[in-house]
Structures are given as C-alpha cells and as structure tokens.
UniProtKB/Swiss-Prot annotation:
Gene3D superfamilies: Rhodopsin 7-helix transmembrane proteins. The keyword Cell membrane applies. It comes from the Eukaryota. Glycans are attached at residues 14, 22, 202. Disulfide bonds join 127-210. It is found in: Cell membrane. Residues 33-49 are annotated as: Required for response to orexin-A. This is Orexin receptor type 2. Keywords: Cell membrane, Disease variant, Disulfide bond, G-protein coupled receptor, Glycoprotein, Membrane, Receptor, Transducer, Transmembrane, Transmembrane helix.
Length: 444
C-alpha cells in the first residue's frame, strides 16, 4: 500500500543520487591532482565511514531486521502448527508476513548499504532483481490488506452475499502473487546501473547508482502517478471506507444474520418476565445470547487489530510515497542546496518502510490473544530447550557418576557376599558329624 519503489524507496537506490552529488564533483574534476592514497582517504572519510548519526541508523536497521525476521517467522509457524488458527483472516496474515520476510531478507541489507555509502555495490543483475522484489512485496502487501478488508466487510456487513472459505483464501493468495509479479515487470526492465562520475570509474565503484532509465520524460511521470494511485491511494481509500462500515456494524448496530438485538434478547430472560415453562428453554436462550455476545467481542477484537495494522501500514509508507511523487513527478530535490536534510528525510523514510514489517508481529502480540499465546509458547520452548539441555548434561553426569559408584558398590558387595558365603559353607561343613570314623572331608 505504498507508492514506494525500490529504486526510489529505501531499498535499492541512492536517494541522493545525481543532484546531490553535484556538490561533490568539484574536488574530483581533476583526479590527477590527488595521489591514490589521498583520494582513497577522502572517499573513506566522506562516503564509506559511517558518521555518528549513521551508527544510530545502523543500530535501528539491525533491530528492525531481527524483530521483523523472527516475528514474522513466528506468525507463520503459529498458524502452521495450530489447526484452530487456520482461519481465512490468518491465512492472509501469513501471506502478509511472507511478504515482510521477503522484503526484510532481500532488500533491507542492500538499502542500509546504499543509504550509508550512497553507492550501489551489487551489480547490474541485482539492480534489476532487488527493486523488482521490493515492488512485488509492496504490491502483495497492498492486495493482501485489501483482501482482508474485503473479507471482513462481507463477513460482518453482508454475511449472506458471500461465504469466505479457507480454499478461497488460498486461491486468492496465489492470484495476489501472480498479479503482483506480472504488474511489476516494468520495474525490472527500466532499472540500470550507471556511474555519476565516469572519470572515476576505473578507480572506484563509488558513485555507482541503480536507477530508472526511461525513453522520455513523460513516461516516468505517468508510471509513478499510476504507481502511487494503484499501490497506495486507491487501496487506502477503499479500505478506510470498508473499515468505517465495519466499525458502524460492530460498535453501533446489530450484526446481520443474528436472531435479534442482544439487548432485546435479555428482556424475556429477566426474572419478572420469565416463562413458566421448562427451564431448558431459558437455558438455551441464555446460551444463544452468550454465544452471540462472544462472537461480537471476537469480531471486535479482530477488527480492532486489523484497523491498527492498516493504520500503521499507511503511516509507515506515507513519507516515502510523498517523497517519491515529489521527486519523480514534480522534479523536486534536483538542485537542492540543503542536501543533508533531503538525505535525512529519505533515509528515515526508508527505515520506516522496514519498520512496518517489524511492527506487524508486535501488533498481533498485543491485540490478538491467540497469537500472544503462541509467541509465549515458542519463546518458552526455546528457553526450556536450553534449560533442558543443561539439565540433561547435568543428569547424564550425575547418572554416570552414580553408575560408577553403584558398580563399585555392587562389586564390593559381591566380594563381601562371596567371602561370607565361603565362611558360612566352611562353618557348616566343619560342624557336620563324622561317620564310620571318616573325617568331614571324606564325607563331603
């Protein structure tokens, strides 16, 4: 749900590319004026070595990477291991997590390197692949959130018009990926590597950028306007309308498909107006009302969680979407003098895109009791697994020691028993009476 693209968005291109490098070109117009050692020191100091605030950025990216990867994998595992969690909504949530894992693994590291060094180091092939995967994951996320909103809208506002099933959800997920892979093919076609300072191409790969190359000025403007509308503005407006109606149904009105308003159901259950018939009828009515209240509360919790997911998604992708339109459509930031401010805005916007991937599992943990229980169980298993392994080693050590002691004791006892047996036998023999003048040994 974002007008974010890789080449423009965090992931895979130098947001400060050409216009911002104009200020740095002057020292390199005559590179022969500098020896190689001085030149490399300058590049290291100005472009490669992270500045103080960039160390903060690196720490932020590392935190997001770990949380996004671990959290989204746990979401997938939780739904896979528990059949009771394999609902239509959870299937879509798993698909959203898979898209987040994809963008975290493939695009986040490249984005961090580009934001710090302002250079594309990964070659022509990855210049096409990584931005393409970024836009595919964005499209998958948008379409998945749209399907979730549509599914909830039908289930709550029009339950008799369409029945959602797990099979339909799986088919929808397959269609989402196919459509996303097809409509983002132009992104891979137009991405090309180029150097901003051709005179330095033989000395360093710095100032190499991965950017779009169009045949005319009108095409990128049309493309980015359509991209913004299709992947951000239009889906966002439709989802907001859907959730507004869901909110009205769940919090302000009766859910269609139920027998009557809950408050009305309680009237015949009051002591003064209870029927004098069998008590079983009253119990069944109470059970029906309790089940309906439970259903309403469950739907409210789910709707609340999904609204928060949508809100966070919209906030995280809004800055990069606006900056992308301003840059690509209106040509802003081309000759800016305040390069540091522009760089900071783009860098922060890139980080927000990835922070959204880390935020979703946190939202599930706080707003979904089932996911929270599964996350706790997963962490408990990890902690208990380490604890059990330590206990097993200690137990094996104690068992081995006790076994040796037991074996020694048994051998010692066996020797003692043997000696005692010999004494008993000899004593018994010595006390036997002599027969016919024969001694005891003869009788034996």
């Amino acid at each position: 749900m974002s007008g974010t693209k890789l080449e423009d968005s965090p992931p895979c291109r130098n947001w400060s590319s050409a216009p911002e490098l104009n200020e740095t070109q002057e020292p390199f117009l005559n590179p022969t004026d500098y020896d190689d050692e001085e030149f490399l020191r300058y590049l290291w100091r100005e472009y490669l070595h992270p500045k103080e605030y960039e160390w903060v950025l690196i720490a932020g990216y590392i935190i997001v990477f770990v949380v996004a990867l671990v959290g989204n994998v746990l979401v997938c595992v939780a739904v896979w291991k528990n059949h009771h969690m394999r609902t239509v909504t959870n299937y879509f949530i798993v698909n959203l997590s898979l898209a987040d894992v994809l963008v975290t693994i493939t695009c986040l590291p490249a984005t961090l390197v580009v934001d710090i060094t302002e250079t594309w180091f990964f070659g022509q092939s990855l210049c096409k692949v990584i931005p393409y995967l970024q836009t595919v994951s964005v499209s998958v996320s948008v379409l998945t959130l749209s399907c979730i909103a549509l599914d909830r809208w039908y289930a709550i506002c029009h339950p008799l018009m369409f029945k959602s099933t797990a099979k339909r959800a799986r088919n929808s997920i397959v269609i989402i990926w196919i459509v996303s892979c097809i409509i983002m093919i132009p992104q891979a076609i137009v991405m090309e590597c180029s150097t901003m300072l051709p005179g330095l191409a033989n000395k360093t790969t710095l100032f190499t950028v991965c950017d779009e190359r169009w045949g005319g000025e009108i095409y990128p403007k049309m493309y980015h306007i359509c991209f913004f509308l299709v992947t951000y503005m239009a889906p966002l407006c439709l989802m907001v309308l859907a959730y507004l109606q869901i909110f009205r149904k769940l919090w302000c009105r009766q859910i269609p498909g139920t027998s009557s308003v809950v408050q009305r159901k309680w009237k015949p259950l009051q002591p003064a107006s209870q029927p004098r018939g069998p008590g079983q009828q009253t119990k069944s009515r109470i059970s029906a009302v309790a089940a309906e209240i439970k259903q309403i509360r469950a739907r409210r919790k789910t709707a609340r969680m999904l609204m928060v997911v949508l809100l966070v998604f919209a906030i995280c992708y809004l800055p990069i979407s606006i900056l992308n339109v301003l840059k690509r459509v209106f040509g802003m930031f081309t000759h800016t003098e305040d390069r540091e401010t522009v760089y900071a805005w783009f860098t922060f916007s890139h980080w927000l895109v990835y922070a959204n991937s880390a935020a979703n599992p946190i939202i599930y943990n706080f707003l979904s009791g089932k996911f929270r229980e599964e996350f706790k169980a997963a962490f408990s298993c990890c902690c208990l697994g380490v604890h059990h392994r330590q206990e097993d080693r200690l137990t094996r050590g104690r068992t081995s020691t006790e076994s040796r002691k037991s074996l020694t004791t048994q051998i010692s006892n066996f020797d003692n028993v043997s000696k005692l047996s010999e004494q008993v036998v000899l004593t018994s023999i010595s006390t036997l009476p002599a027969a016919n003048g024969a001694g005891p040994l003869q009788n034996w």
